[in-house]
From Swiss-Prot:
One of its GO terms (cellular component) is periplasmic space. It comes from Salmonella typhi. Pfam families: NANM. Converts alpha-N-acetylneuranimic acid (Neu5Ac) to the beta-anomer, accelerating the equilibrium between the alpha- and beta-anomers. Probably facilitates sialidase-negative bacteria to compete successfully for limited amounts of extracellular Neu5Ac, which is likely taken up in the beta-anomer. In addition, the rapid removal of sialic acid from solution might be advantageous to the bacterium to damp down host responses. The lineage of its organism: Bacteria, Pseudomonadati, Pseudomonadota, Gammaproteobacteria, Enterobacterales. This is N-acetylneuraminate epimerase.
Length: 384
């Protein structure tokens, strides 16, 4: 996608202490084959029968599935997505259908990148896609979503559609001598001026309706990770503006169709670092009651720059892909160890007590096709 995509990737781009923590690559975890093609900035979900579906992102319009209950597990290609290639969509299973919300892409080879507000659903029984007769209340890119029940999904966060789209329109229209000025003007603003979405939306697939469920207790974010367990929502880090992350983790309870926000927590600094920059594009999921968060990416030093008044906070800083894994154990966050390689912007899927990390972007910015997993077992973190 040329210069537009390069800029997009740039932008987007002590109770617990008594627990024995170890890293091992052997044990009980399930081994899955690599996905057929490298995947980053894609999306995925798992149905009630243990079948994982992943696609979009660098896979273009391709989608694949794998049945975790089969003895011989292989990826199978399903019908291609009809809505065009796109990145950063969110997908969940509702009423036995795979729903795909929003994303960012190009309508044709000549058009600039733009945010989508459309919704598609896939029938595994018929192997068919259908565009749903609805649009989201705001454009959805950099958003996150969690399934509430068989008919409802919670969606929040994401960039401001109009500001985001305008940036890529300006980049497309600028000649080479003007591009750096456009880029600087876009990044050199305080976080509040990006108007990231902080409204929480509930989509009801049965009624095909959208509902405003309130707002986040703090700033809107993009590129956050989210998980739902026993009616408790965890919204993990994300960008406050392009290049600047937050280390805050929002926590809420979903009860009687109402979201109640609880006390926030913060991810601890990585070993050897003075502060936690926060993560975008991290993997996350629960294993035996422990919330695990790993990978993602940030710009070390951007937070201090922003505190010092430098709005283009990541200017001149190399993006760093992370390999640290953190665990929330008995209400306390702790460092658990390292992944096999630094990785972010892949797909997290939980099944039983395993968290599968599918695809992602490595430290060279390249998509990978590997599938690894996190599992807590007898007080140990197994990475396979």
């Amino acid at each position: 996608m040329g210069m537009q995509m390069k800029n997009f990737k740039k932008m987007m781009t002590l109770m617990a202490l008594c627990l024995s923590v170890a890293i091992t690559t052997s044990g009980y975890a399930t081994t899955l084959p690599d996905i057929p093609e490298p995947l980053k900035n894609g999306t995925g979900a798992i149905d009630n029968n243990g079948v994982i579906y992943v696609g979009l992102g660098t896979a273009g319009t391709s989608w694949y599935k794998i049945d975790l209950k089969k003895q011989h597990k292989d990826w199978e290609r399903i019908k291609s997505f009809p809505g065009g290639a796109r990145e950063q969509s969110v997908s969940v299973f509702l009423n036995d259908k795979l729903y795909v919300f929003g994303g960012v892409g190009k309508k044709n080879s000549e058009s600039p990148l733009q945010v989508y507000s459309d919704v598609y659903k896939y029938s595994p029984v018929k192997n068919t896609w259908q565009k749903v007769d609805t649009i989201s209340p705001v454009g959805l890119t950099g958003h996150t979503g969690v399934k509430l029940n068989e008919t409802m999904v919670l969606i929040t966060g994401g960039v401001n559609e109009h500001i985001f789209d305008k940036y890529f329109i300006d980049i497309a229209a600028a000649d080479e001598s003007e591009k750096n000025k456009v880029i600087y003007n876009y990044f050199n603003k305080p976080a509040k001026d990006y108007f990231f979405n902080k409204i929480v939306f509930i989509y009801n697939a049965k009624e095909n309706t959208w509902k405003n469920a309130g707002e986040l207790p703090g700033a809107g974010t993009a590129g956050s990770s989210s998980v739902m367990e026993n009616n408790f929502l965890m919204l993990i880090n994300g960008e406050l503006k392009p290049g600047l992350r937050t280390d805050v983790i929002y926590r809420a309870m979903w009860d009687n169709d109402k979201l109640t926000w609880l006390k926030n927590s913060q991810l601890p600094p990585s070993p050897g670092e003075q502060q936690q920059e926060g993560l975008a594009g991290a993997f996350s999921g629960y294993s035996h009651g422990v919330l695990l968060v790993g990978g993602g990416a940030n710009f070390p030093g951007a937070k201090q720059n922003y505190t010092n008044g430098k709005f283009y906070s990541h200017e001149g800083i190399n993006k760093k892909w992370r390999d640290e894994v953190y665990g929330l154990i008995n209400g306390h966050w702790q460092y658990m160890g390292k992944m096999k390689q630094p990785l972010g912007y892949g797909v997290s899927v939980s099944y039983g007590d395993e968290v599968f990390l599918i695809g992602g972007e490595n430290a060279k910015g390249k998509p990978v096709s590997s599938v690894t997993s996190f599992t807590m077992r007898d007080g140990n973190l197994l990475i396979k």
